[in-house]
Amino acid sequence: MIADRYADLAFEHCTHQVLADITSRHGVDFATTLFYDRIRRSPQNRELVAALESAGAETERPQARGRILIAPALFYRERPDIGGDGAAIQRAALAAGLDVEILPVASAGTARTNAEQLRTLLYERCTDPTVLVSLSKGAADVRLAFESMPPPPGLRAWVIVSGLLHGTPAIDRLTRRWWSRWGLRLLLARHGAPFELASEFSAYKSSSLRKPALAPPGILVVNLFGCPLAAHVGTRFGRIRHRQLSALGPNDGLTLLRDAFVQPGLIYPLWGADHYFRTDAVPGLLSRLITFLVAKDCLRAAARVR
């Protein structure tokens, strides 16, 4: 069994280089499965894993009081069909009785520009208790905002879904050749995005996203991301990117999994989901996440209904 291979390899030892070496020996699917196993076995994540996989929670719908703020993904207005507006999170939160708001950042804005907006929006919108949920590139927006501000009063937790927190080699590959760079420039221009946006997410050039992402003090951080094998990646371009990134280690079709979370923080990898985090398991997972956040005093408890 894969769980028995590399028995002495703990989660904290799964560096970029170690995962790349394992991938070169055994393939990306093996490395992905091993990384998934080590995340789940890590003592810091066991409570979260147990809570999000609790069979008893399936028959109950959580009821809570508080606010969910969503930092949306890139092009969330132009492409709501890919879930960047957090529709699944909105449904789960509203069903639980929570107030929900999408933070009105620029849909095609750079991380730097959106971070500036968020510094004001978070102080204006946070009430006690509030949970901030960031989606994909929205995690980079939030990360940069927090690097120059303390968490606002009332903010209890930051939930990162498919966090695009660092640069990704997928962008560098697109900007390396003139024809793919031209295609990327056209795609960004079509949605009103500056080419600076691509430069921000370079894994190799100077960028404010190159240094490790750190959790802001005093709030709970929960990282959720897909953990796909090659066959799980759901789009044609996602499969191409997954294959291109596979020599570097486990990835979700857009970013390396080792770059998809903030520490210190709790981590839950969703088996079979890719970067878009869309599987049949997601609605139940989000419902149980709300129950977990209530138990952690990040949201207020209310009467449960069956």
Feature-to-residue mapping (PLM):
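Serine-dependent carboxylesterase/thioesterase catalytic core
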Residues: E116-A215
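C-terminal catalytic-base region of ester-bond hydrolases, centering on the histidine
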Residues: P217-R306
